Structures are given as structure tokens and as C-alpha cells.
């Protein structure tokens, strides 16, 4: 996911390892890790409480760090020490384990998680496409299932929407600083009911301000 768009095709260049920051979409659907040289993600969005990052690195890319790379950022060192070169973030590791067990045992795997996420996102996108007050600027095939962006008729209305939404219990809807508008983050932990209530609020706001 980049700002408000989600990559559909994975670019492949022969001889060039692909490195991806998957913080916004990891564990939201299956990923073919063999297509990547390195996958990096912070756990704070879809995995566990903030405080840890995870890297999946292809074996042939290890052992080539320059001498200027700090020890704490050298994946070869971290791997050799079983990720415990320094004191590990125990709480984050524990919570990550619980989430992984939940995804496997309760959800039934990432294929099912993907279906749930696509269904959640569809509720919000269908609403956005069915009226003209709020707009989503992203081409359909590049729409993110994790971060749904939208705008109202003007920036002042965006501010009013965010303020009234916060009063109604919908927090952190202000969009990315580079693109403005609003951004609804509907990660794995967001239940379908949360998306439905947001849509209900958006419709009430639209009727009151259109």
C-alpha cells in the first residue's frame, strides 16, 4: 500500500532483489514471499502493539552488509543471535504469537482473512461509489482493502467531518499529510460492524451538509 493505493502486480526485474515494506497489509491476505528479496514490516498495524518490526530476508542477501551498517541493523547478526542480540521486545513477540494462532485457528488462515477484509472494504467502497458528496480518488483496481481514502466537497468540510466524527467516536480519520482528505484504516482487527457504523455516520453527515 502506498499512501492510498495498493499494488496489484508485483514488479520483477531479473537480478534485482525486490524489497517491500508491507506494514499496512501484512497478514491481510496470502503473500508469495518467494518473489521478494526482503519483506519488512512494523507490527503496529496488523500484527501486534507498536514496538517491533519483522524482516523476512532471502538467504543469499545476508552477509553483504557494509562496515558502516550499525550492528543493530545488520540482519546477519540478528539471525546469528536468534533475534536476541539485544533484549527482545517480549510483549510484542508474545502478542504476535497470539495473533498468528488466532489467524490460523479462529479465522482459518489468510485466505479467509482476505475474504473478510475484502467484504469489509466493499461496504465502504460501495457507499462511496453510490453517492456524490464523498469521493474516492483511486482507480478501482488499485484500491486498498486496508486504508480507504475519501474526500468531501472541500478542505473545510473535511475538517468539519473529522471533528464531528471524533465526537461520535470515530477517531484518527484525518488523511495522510501529503494527500489530505480522510483515511479510514480498516485493518484485520476492525470488525465489520465498525465499518457499517462509519458508513451510517457518513450518510448522516452527508444529509446534514449536502
List where the protein language model places each region:
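Short, small-residue-biased leader/transition segments that mark boundaries at the very start
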Residues: 1-2
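Active-site C-terminal subdomain of aminotransferase-like
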Residues: 43-125, 139, 208-210
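Conserved PLP-binding catalytic core of the aspartate aminotransferase-like
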Residues: 134-165
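A short alpha/beta connector and helix-capping loop motif
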Residues: 30-45
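General beta-strand structural signal in soluble alpha/beta enzymes
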Residues: 18-22, 40-42, 172-175
Amino acid at each position: 500500500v502506498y499512501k492510498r493505493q495498493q499494488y496489484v502486480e508485483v514488479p520483477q526485474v531479473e537480478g534485482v532483489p525486490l524489497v517491500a515494506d508491507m506494514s499496512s497489509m501484512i497478514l491481510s491476505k496470502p503473500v508469495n514471499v518467494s518473489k521478494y528479496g526482503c519483506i519488512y514490516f512494523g507490527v503496529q498495524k496488523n500484527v501486534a502493539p507498536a514496538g517491533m518490526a519483522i524482516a523476512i530476508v532471502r538467504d543469499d542477501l545476508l552477509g553483504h552488509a557494509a562496515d558502516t551498517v550499525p550492528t543493530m541493523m545488520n540482519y546477519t547478526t540478528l539471525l546469528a543471535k536468534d533475534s536476541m542480540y539485544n533484549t527482545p521486545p517480549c510483549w510484542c513477540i508474545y502478542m504476535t504469537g497470539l495473533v498468528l494462532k488466532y489467524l490460523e485457528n479462529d479465522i482459518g488462515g489468510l485466505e479467509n482473512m482476505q475474504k473478510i477484509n475484502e467484504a469489509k472494504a466493499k461496504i465502504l467502497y460501495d457507499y462511496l461509489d453510490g453517492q456524490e458528496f464523498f469521493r474516492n480518488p483511486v482507480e478501482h483496481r488499485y484500491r486498498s482493502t486496508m486504508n480507504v481514502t475519501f474526500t468531501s466537497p472541500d478542505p473545510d468540510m473535511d475538517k468539519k467531518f473529522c471533528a464531528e466524527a471524533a465526537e461520535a467516536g470515530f477517531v484518527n480519520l484525518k488523511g495522510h499529510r501529503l494527500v489530505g482528505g480522510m483515511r479510514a484504516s480498516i485493518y484485520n482487527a476492525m470488525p465489520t460492524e465498525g465499518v457499517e457504523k462509519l458508513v451510517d455516520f457518513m450518510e448522516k453527515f452527508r444529509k446534514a451538509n449536502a
